[in-house]
Regions:
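N-terminal beta1-alpha1 cap of cysteine-dependent amidohydrolase-like domains
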Residues: 1-100, 104-122, 128-136, 197, ...
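A short, compositionally biased
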Residues: 136-138, 183
Length: 280
């Protein structure tokens, strides 16, 4: 069987590529870290940098171009100008795209999200400065929409993940937010400990996102963007309460070494979808 191939973008301030690459490999993918310039210059020449040979494209977290002109703006411009047509072809071929934190900001600036009516050019939503005016680094509870078409969150109802950003507030017009909810494109909302949406309350909603929106997808469910970091929860010891989890595992005589974090479920869903679709 051929492997499920994932491409993780690197370069110019993207700094979560190693853990994202690791998470994809844990999920069963053949993952490659590829510099943006290599991808742009290497089309068709080397299978390790030829986008058409991959099934999953990852815009990871970090601070691309130091967030100059706004988070994800320069990265989106460079991608759109140089390989925008290849990205659109990648999407038309039924492949998967995920944007995490800075990657989500880039997808929004590219117009790939929300992709209303199949339009992957128009920018219609934004991720802007946190209400606090400060960079945040904490963990959040997420409520996952059970009706969403998002392929990455299949079988997940709630999940805890870390967030670390300065421009994570989801903002859009009332009309566009209503459209997102009507089409079930709102994938994840910040939630309280009871699993209910945070209703804008801090710290459960850490940035002031309208309607507690933490992640959205396009109408097909194959393009997903979220501010929290699933790759940041690749092992149970990543969690701030890991010592309590360790005590429970030891009591149940379960393996500690191989007990992965819940964030891997998002990547595994992607790998399993591609495996089934392409029979790889």
């Amino acid at each position: 069987m051929s492997p499920v191939r994932a491409l993780v973008l690197t370069g110019y301030g993207l700094n979560c590529d190693y853990e994202t690459d690791y998470a994809l490999k844990l999920a069963g993918a053949e993952s490659h870290r590829v510099h943006i310039n290599e991808l742009i210059s290497g089309q068709g020449s080397n299978p390790d940098v030829d986008l058409s040979t991959f099934h999953i494209l990852v815009f990871g977290g970090g601070f691309a171009w130091a967030d100059d002109h706004g988070a994800g703006v320069v990265l989106a411009s460079k991608i759109k100008f140089n390989i925008g047509e290849q990205i659109e072809r990648f999407i038309r071929d039924g492949k998967l795209v995920i944007g995490i934190c800075n990657g989500f900001q880039s997808l929004v600036n590219l117009g790939l999200l929300p992709g209303f009516r199949g339009d992957y050019q128009e920018r219609s939503v934004a991720l802007t400065y946190n209400d606090s005016g400060n960079f945040i680094d904490t963990w959040v509870n997420l409520k996952i929409n059970p009706e969403t078409p998002c392929l990455f969150t299949k079988g997940i109802s709630h999940i805890e993940l870390p967030v670390r950003h300065g421009e994570g507030k989801f903002y859009a017009s009332t009309e566009d937010i209503e459209s997102l909810f009507e089409s079930n494109q709102v994938v994840a909302q910040y939630a309280n400990e009871d699993g209910n949406p945070a209703s804008g309350q801090w710290p459960e909603n850490p940035n002031g996102s309208l309607e507690d929106i933490a992640g959205i997808c396009d109408p097909t469910g194959r393009i997903f963007g979220l501010m929290p970091h699933p790759e940041g929860f690749n092992h149970f010891t990543n969690h701030p309460n890991w010592t309590e989890k360790k005590r429970i595992l030891e009591k149940e005589r379960k393996s500690i070494k191989n007990h992965e974090g819940d964030g891997i479920r998002i990547f595994r869903n992607a790998v399993e979808y591609i495996s089934e679709r392409y029979k790889v």
